[in-house]
Amino acid sequence: MLSERDKSRGDIRLEYENRKKRLKQQSLAGRQYVDFTLVDSLGCERKISDYVGKSDLLFLDFWASWCGPCRAQEPQLVRLYQEYRSKGFEILGVSLDANRTSWLSVLRKKENHWTDLCIAKKEDDKRVRELYSINGIPYGILIDKSGKIANVVTAGWVHLEMLLKGYYKGRNEETK
């Protein structure tokens, strides 16, 4: 049985690890994205590089069929997509599902209109999680047209909405 002192040490270690992960996530901003391979619903391989640079902003939406919060936040993401797509915003869904059948089943029911892909192999899943410091989902990475990571979104899609408003407001002011 753990003493109160040992429990406290465990809490401190956990808090330390969480802070370390958050700092690593924050340090991704400004870096060039790292490419990785995914598969589409037909089993064809795709790469992130197939999508980067095609729009002003590309949002990588990391999710999974078993993730309740991911599914609960999807209507808000659909709304943001509808609002900002014509301005140059695109979404690429990246499923972390290990079970392709579960992914495809949920994909058929989703009401989004963006491309959804799935991690190709189990070893790719681990690599992607490490590369992008993913320790929970929903999780998002906003990539600009040049391929630089503009921001990491871990606090829900309200944070994404604030980023989009700021980005497009700034762009509108530049064109005046």
Residue ranges of predicted features:
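Oxidative protein folding and maturation machinery
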Residues: M1-R46
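Generic structural signal for well-ordered beta-strand positions
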Residues: R46-K47, A150
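Residue-level structural signal for beta-strand termini and adjacent loop
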Residues: D50-Y51, A155
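Alpha/beta-hydrolase fold active-site loops
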Residues: S55-L58, P138
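Conserved redox-active cysteine motifs that mediate thiol-disulfide chemistry
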Residues: D56, F62-R79
